[in-house]
Regions:
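Nucleotide-activated chemistry modules centered on ATP-dependent adenylation/adenylyltransferase
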Residues: 2-364
Length: 364
């Protein structure tokens, strides 16, 4: 085989090489958030009274719904027995037009009737939930078109990912609930800065295992390392995680606190009027009672080019609502106490309503 030496190589050309195409800029690496070394990995205790004793603040998140209401009654009962009711703060994340009318006022009334002196309302700044869907769509569309151009494809033919929240992309919870509530944690931490140590906040959430397979996997007590830092340690407590629907309603009956009328209309849950995780019955109820909001959602479907819920459009939900209106007439609230009676019986429900009339002047 012929060998080559250095002198056999072709002479170097003096012609300038053709310019190379610029490599696409590498995406900026997201900085990994480090958790402060003082934040514990696991809770020190899972015993309810010990959790309350250890906490500097006991923050109860209230949506105004039945699970929040039952949880509030239980937490207040334990805190009062310990002489620590002054630690309890109730917070409501105001969702604007997305939530049922009067929900914030009901959540505050429930807190006041329980004897809680501090009630806080937080709200995400800027656009509301429905407008955030449109903003998100614009960003997703711009990103998809940019990637298509870089790949030499027609940007007009790109498929834009769904902008609506979903069970796998619950950005609505982080944007309009969890994020704003963390701003309250920051304020509460500042109020106890004189302690000279991380402030201990017990965050109470009314999530129950019976609601879904996903919630069944949640721990009753855990450290919220994402919300904790060197100034505050957040322990998440789900006091009613193992409770059944019947136990929730029995607690409400004993508490004598008013509950939201949407349950008498047949709703299983009280979240957004039109929640992407809601069942068909809850969504149709929402469209019948707040038709102008359902119409706004339907218009947004057209704007973002995707159904409100995978396999179920808001247009179809509105159609089902109209069918029921034609069959039953305009929706009217069934007799007060209907929802409770299904779980605890009419006798206990009548007793609950009579107590409300005597104590709070509410109609029996």
């Amino acid at each position: 085989m012929q060998s080559h030496t250095l002198f056999d190589l072709s002479p170097l050309t003096t012609q300038s090489p053709a310019p190379m195409a610029a490599a696409p800029a590498a995406p900026k690496a997201r900085r990994k958030r480090t958790v402060h070394v003082s934040v514990p990995l696991v809770p020190r205790t899972t015993v309810p009274d010990e959790l309350i004793r250890d906490a500097d603040w006991v923050v109860v998140s209230s949506s105004g719904g039945k699970d929040s209401q039952a949880m509030l009654s239980y937490v207040v009962q334990r805190a009062r027995a310990l002489g620590m009711l002054d630690k309890v703060v109730v917070v409501h994340a105001d969702l604007g037009r997305a939530e049922w009318d009067g929900t914030r006022e009901l959540a505050e009334l429930q807190a006041r009737l329980c004897g809680v002196r501090r009630f806080e309302v937080v709200r995400a700044p800027g656009a509301d939930l429905l407008d955030r869907v449109k903003i998100r769509y614009g960003k997703l569309k711009a990103k998809a078109e940019k990637e298509a151009r870089e790949a030499g494809e027609d940007p007009a033919r790109v498929k834009v990912p769904p902008a609506w929240p979903s069970s796998s992309a619950r950005w609505c919870t982080s944007d309009v609930k969890r994020g704003p509530i963390r701003t309250l944690y920051t304020r509460l931490t500042g109020e106890l800065a004189h302690l000279g140590r991380p402030v201990r906040i017990l965050a109470c959430i009314g999530q129950r295992a019976a609601e879904s397979d996903q919630r069944a996997k949640l721990a009753p007590v855990e450290i919220d390392r994402g919300a904790s830092n060197g100034k505050r340690h957040i322990t998440t407590w789900r006091p009613t995680h193992a409770w059944s629907d019947r136990k929730v309603w029995r607690t409400i009956a004993r508490s004598r606190l008013p509950y939201h009328p949407a349950y008498d209309w047949g709703n299983r849950r009280l979240s957004c009027v039109l929640c992407v995780l809601g069942c068909n019955n809850d969504l149709v109820n929402g469209a019948r009672r707040v038709p102008e909001l359902a119409a706004a959602y339907a218009r947004t479907e057209v704007t973002v080019g995707a159904d409100f819920k995978k396999g179920l459009s808001m247009a179809e939900i509105i159609r089902r609502a109209r069918v029921l209106d034609e069959l039953e007439g305009s929706a009217a609230r069934p007799p007060a106490g209907t929802a409770m009676a299904r779980h605890v019986g009419r006798a206990q429900t009548n007793k609950y309503r009579s107590r409300q009339a005597v104590l709070y002047g509410l109609p029996a």
